[in-house]
Amino acid sequence: MRILFLGTPDFASVHLEFLMKNGFDVVAVISQPDKPKGRGKKILPTPVKEVALKYNIPVFQPKKLNKEGLKIIENLKPDIGIVVAYGKLLKPPFLNTLEFYNVHASLLPSYRGAAPIQRVLENGEKRTGITIFKIGEGMDDGPIALKKEVEVGEFETFGELYEKLLDLGKKALIEFLNNYPIELIPQEGKVSFAPKITKEDLKLDFSKDVTFVKNKIRAYDPLPGVRVLFKRKIVKLFGVFSVLENSSREIGKIISIDKEGALISCENGSVKVRYIQFPGKRKMTFFEAKNGCLIKEGECFDC
């Protein structure tokens, strides 16, 4: 089976490498154009491109997929297209040239869109998974070939769930390809969406419900980290690991700090958080920050 692989970030590159290690014939890779990264704004290859070059797979990075993509398919004649976090919607006529299947990090039709892992955590879902579906003209609405479920822990972070779904996704992709063609099932159930993350999403408000605060912190841990004001400066918080109900203290107040973390009051309770990061400094425990005279009990985060 001749595979055309479309993907861009790390999540996609792991899937591509797993295909190669399992002996699949990837005839070409299409990835987004290279972009400047880091403080020096140096142009760096996408993670998928790096893997493709490692295995001597032809790489294409068209700005307009419909124009250049048609030539790629005409010349290489792939049997199937696999899409993992490519970064753009596929549209006709390119979409109609062969069957394209997408590996999506949610249980469709729930959480269609760009940020399913973060939105699952924000909403406190107890289960999520991987869906492999045939791409249609709508956003993540095509018929399903394969679904795999996993449980989501109460304090599981974005980083932890990302790794879990990454492992599940690459194995599901191999299973799908080994059994292709698979009978497709239309998507059924309640549709929900997972829009792209904005700066507003990263703002933490301790005046909200304690469960909301807990889920907000873990949804962006370890990257990019939720933001909250402390003494008129933006700090980041990570590592929420406990909640207490029915606190009646001042909102955003640091009730206590010990070696485990800081207990911070919310609307109807308090959360225990392990790490804080001040501007221009490394991430540190609250206990380290207290010993360094950067923070103390009784002080408050701005809401």
Swiss-Prot record:
Q: List the disulfide bonds.
A: none
Q: What is this protein called?
A: Methionyl-tRNA formyltransferase
Q: Name one Pfam family in it.
A: Formyl_trans_N
Function as written in the Swiss-Prot or TrEMBL entry: Attaches a formyl group to the free amino group of methionyl-tRNA(fMet). The formyl group appears to play a dual role in the initiator identity of N-formylmethionyl-tRNA by promoting its recognition by IF2 and preventing the misappropriation of this tRNA by the elongation apparatus.
EC supergroup of this enzyme: transferase
Which is one Gene Ontology cellular component term of this protein? cytosol
List, alphabetically, the PANTHER family matched: METHIONYL-TRNA FORMYLTRANSFERASE, METHIONYL-TRNA FORMYLTRANSFERASE, MITOCHONDRIAL
The UniProt family comment states:
Belongs to the Fmt family.
Keywords associated with the record: Protein biosynthesis, Transferase
Residue sites binding (6S)-5,6,7,8-tetrahydrofolate per the record: 106-109
Catalytic activity, as annotated = L-methionyl-tRNA(fMet) + (6R)-10-formyltetrahydrofolate = N-formyl-L-methionyl-tRNA(fMet) + (6S)-5,6,7,8-tetrahydrofolate + H(+)
In alphabetical order, the GO MF annotations are:
methionyl-tRNA formyltransferase activity
Its EC number(s): 2.1.2.9
What InterPro entries does this protein's entry cite?
Fmt, Formyl_trans_C, Formyl_transf_N, Formyl_transf_N_sf, Formyl_transferase-like_C_sf, Met-tRNA-FMT_C, Met-tRNA-FMT_N
